[in-house]
């Protein structure tokens, strides 16, 4: 009978540790925007249609976005 329990024991895996709860962010943790510049307005309709900004709007936005790894990080 001990051989039976030995075989069963090798298949049982330990439970992974419980995941840490993510802290909820509330208004008191968020400060005022710094260096904010309103470039243009894109309505929810354009975003829902999946349209990409084009022409002057795209160039204006591209000139303001910080670059990461030599590429534009947002556009």
From Swiss-Prot:
It is a lipid-anchor. Probably involved in the organization of the actin cytoskeleton by acting downstream of CDC42, inducing actin filament assembly. The keyword Heme does not apply. Belongs to the CDC42SE/SPEC family. GO terms for molecular function: small GTPase binding. GO terms for cellular component: cytoplasm; cytoskeleton; plasma membrane. A lipid is attached at residues 10-11 (S-palmitoyl cysteine). InterPro entries: CRIB_dom, CRIB_dom_sf, SPEC. Pfam families: PBD. It comes from the Eukaryota. Keywords: Cell membrane, Cell shape, Cytoplasm, Cytoskeleton, Lipoprotein, Membrane, Palmitate. Residues 30-43 form the CRIB domain. Residues 45-75 are annotated as: Disordered. This is CDC42 small effector protein 1. The keyword Cytoplasm applies. The lineage of its organism: Eukaryota, Metazoa, Chordata, Craniata, Vertebrata.
